[in-house]
Curated annotation (Swiss-Prot):
The gene is mdh. NAD(+) binds at residues 10-15, 34, 96, 119-121. The keyword Membrane does not apply. The lineage of its organism: Bacteria, Pseudomonadati, Pseudomonadota, Alphaproteobacteria, Hyphomicrobiales. Belongs to the LDH/MDH superfamily. MDH type 3 family. GO terms for biological process: lactate metabolic process; tricarboxylic acid cycle. This is Malate dehydrogenase. NCBIfam families: MalateDH_bact, PRK06223.1. One of its GO terms (molecular function) is L-lactate dehydrogenase activity.
Amino acid sequence: MARKKIALIGSGMIGGTLAHMIGLKELGDVVLFDIEEGMPQGKALDIAESSPVDGFDVSLTGANVYEAIEGADVVIVTAGVARKPGMSRDDLLGINLKVMEQVGAGIKKYASSAFVICITNPLDAMVWALQKFSGLPKQKVVGMAGVLDSARFRYFLSKEFKVSVKDVTAFVLGGHGDSMVPLVRYSTVGGISLPDLVKMGWTTQEKIDQIIQRVRNGGAEIVGLLKTGSAFYAPAASAISMAEAYLKDIKRVVPVATYLSGEYGVKDTYVGVPVVLGAGGVERVIEIDLDKKERSAFEQSVNAVKKLCEACIAIAPCLK
């Protein structure tokens, strides 16, 4: 049986990390694409030369033309401008929307059967635009945000409680931005809910609130520390987990930016909610009960995403 083909659009820090992780997991053959000549070829060769040491057998190639992604089973899109200190994800909209138009056309022509994972910011608006530009089925085009935001939430909680990250479950709803909604009520440590852990005296509500704010500021915190770039290890790992769920039909329950057509009372918008991810792409959107406060925060987040989509339409009326 032929190996799966995974195309990576954008060969920056996330793209290179994705390629290496795919090789280590032997998920499939890799095509690194970038408009900058030499960049994808150099990274592909460098990673390929590590394969005898790490003991993996996959093909890694670099390319500057979209023909190279033809027939890809999975396409992961990281192309675009990354944040710099002082910038919000929303500041990238105008530049990265034009990139999504080009990428969407390339996917539409050469990889129309692929499962597409978008990482480019501002995430929710970019994946919404990418689906429209590519014309691919909505359940086959998703955004990577919730897995990353939830991983940050889980990590910070594990540090607070001094327990293994494996025993912490948590997830984040809404857009990938300052209005994201970390759900405390649905988050657990060893099956014990966070509100119960507060009652048990393991932590305080004040500390939980501080963690929530740190989750919302997670990307900016790393941008501020790096100064010349943004996060790439955790975003890449998050996207790989999604690609693996699709390629191996694992039926993972994960939060992703997916198209909503009435779920949660939201229509024609991509926003982060829990889904079942398998060989059919988004196979099911999971609607959880939200209390009044959670619902209000979620609606605020959705409205922030809708404003970004309206800004996209103002730039590219064809998206309407």
